[in-house]
Amino acid sequence: MTNSRWAAELVEAVLEGRATEARALTRTVLDAGTPPEEILDGGLIPAMAEAGRRFEDQRFFLPELLFAARAMKEALALIKPLLAERDVPPQGRVVIGTVAGDLHDIGKNIVAAMLEGGGFAVHDLGVNVSAATFAEAVLEHDADLVGLSALLTTTMPVMKEVVEELRRRGVREKVRVLVGGAPLTESFAAEIGADGYAATAALAVDAAKRILAGEPNGDCESGAEGQSSGSDGGQGSGPSPVVTLSDAGRVPAPEPSSATPIGGPAVGTGVGPGADSLEPLSPRELVKAALDFRAPPRLPRQMWVLPWAQTRHPEELERIERDFPQDIITIPFACSEPVPGGGNAHAVGTFVDAWGCTFENLQDGIIGQVKAPRLADWSEAADLRFPRERLEVELEKVTAFCGGTDLFVLAGTCPRPFERLQFLRGSEALYLDLNRPPAELLELIRRLHAFYMEELTIWAKTEVDALTFMDDWGSQRALLVAPELWREIFKPLYADYVALAHRHGKHAFMHSDGHITEIIPDLIEIGLDALNSQVFCMGVEELGRRFAGEITFWGEMDRQQLLPRGTTAQIADAARRMRAAFHRNGGLIAQCEFGPGARPQNIYAIFEALDG
């Protein structure tokens, strides 16, 4: 087999995720006497470089990238020991990990794979890695580069601790520091003293090579710091931020019912066109006027309050609640039968939910990550127990609650099929499944959908005003999966939820994090009434230009950059931009999340600005 032929075949096998074939071909080429470094340089490095390019231009999504990385690792496992025997120097020695307090790892795992495929020797320290552990690993492995990943805004300061610890150990001058993660920016990297910032997992290899060569870290020139109309600080104009190192592993957001919307009396004054009376609007009618584009006298308000805010800022929270009473509330979940599971979902430690999924949490006030999938093997799927106790809703309590408030009431359940599949299967395993969906996955989706429809039907027959559902579908710059796959498998599920709500005279509300612009037309097509999404990730003005007047934007204010680090003036400016972009005699709800890292004065400033 000629060099050009085996190289082309190996590249193709890796890109198509044919792991067994990639390993077998590598063995054949090795047995023919080809040096391992030639296989690395001629096949694996070009394959992963092409995978990165396809990921960047959205020909690949997470399932395809993970499949390619898995095939590359199979081939690399054969040549790594041979490279060591021949003393072939790597491109560099890298220590990588997710910083202390953070359990997210998919993005970090992809970066590690990309670096290995780029010829680096990589020592992956895993997740929740302390500054001391990073420093010790640098010394142990004589590392040239440290890769730091974080997804939570509350763990970003740990990156600075790592830099300082390296300096304290006397190794900072010999090792370079590369950082990445969804909430990070190039300016943050400079602020903490890092040498570089990888805007995307696919660009991590080039970024690493540049900073090790002492060159400017040019990967950020793509516009990650350009502050587009939909990016962090609300300044300047340019492309939206690109997907970051750990972004692929973003934690699915807590169910809205697990955050605590604060409700209180609120009355609008006046009515919009088409109303029969000049009586003040109740909060419920105010929200309906916004949803129906009937010119409500002010924007409806809702604040999602996580326990983190309740324990750290009780006085400020009370002031916000007093000055800006909320119009929307999620009904407390009530079942006549005990629901399985145990522990506190927002406390440090482990929590088992009603489905038997075990979450690990390192920080009080937020929800943790599933680290022991319930369905590690598909053979266990037939025995999976669905929590039918959730169907025993105490209807009398629901009726009394809805009748006793003039707030707009959201149902006390929130189906999340994609995220439930991740919790059951494990995120990385599910992405691999989705690349070539096995029959077991499709059957589980069918069963899950039937259960959710049964649960939603119960709530649709109550007096609540809206049904809710959620799934986080975006990275920082694109969908997590190919739009075609989403439309084939998941869009029909959401269409059923919306149709069910409308048949019973309810509105349909959905939450989805990340850059989901590609599927918003689909959500409008199926009749979704309100969408909670990261509008600053996608571009406020662009979203308004394309979709204002067709769907209600249920918030939200930027919680990656503005809420934790912005000034009140920046918040006010961002709020004005949202109103200008989205409000068309309705179509905008003043919503934000008071969660980890958010400054209380910024939460106050949102409602103050949007009330004007």
What are these regions (language model features)?
Residues Y197-R210, Q534-C537, L588-C592:
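Glycine-rich phosphate-binding active-site loops on the catalytic face of alpha/beta enzymes
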Residues G268, G272-R312, N361, D383-G612:
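Active-site loop segments of alpha/beta catalytic cores
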Residues M1-D87:
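Long amphipathic alpha-helical segments
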Residues G52-E64, A150-T153, F469-P483:
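Glycine-rich, proline-tolerant flexible connector loops at the mouths of alpha/beta enzymes
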Residues P216-S277:
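Intrinsically disordered, low-complexity terminal tails and inter-domain linkers enriched
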Residues V111-G118, H123-A194, T200-K209:
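Cofactor-cradling patches in redox/metallo enzymes
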Residues Q91-L125:
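Glycine-rich active-site/cofactor-binding loop and its immediate structural neighborhood
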Residues R70, G341-R385, G404-F408:
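A contiguous, low-structure linker/loop signature
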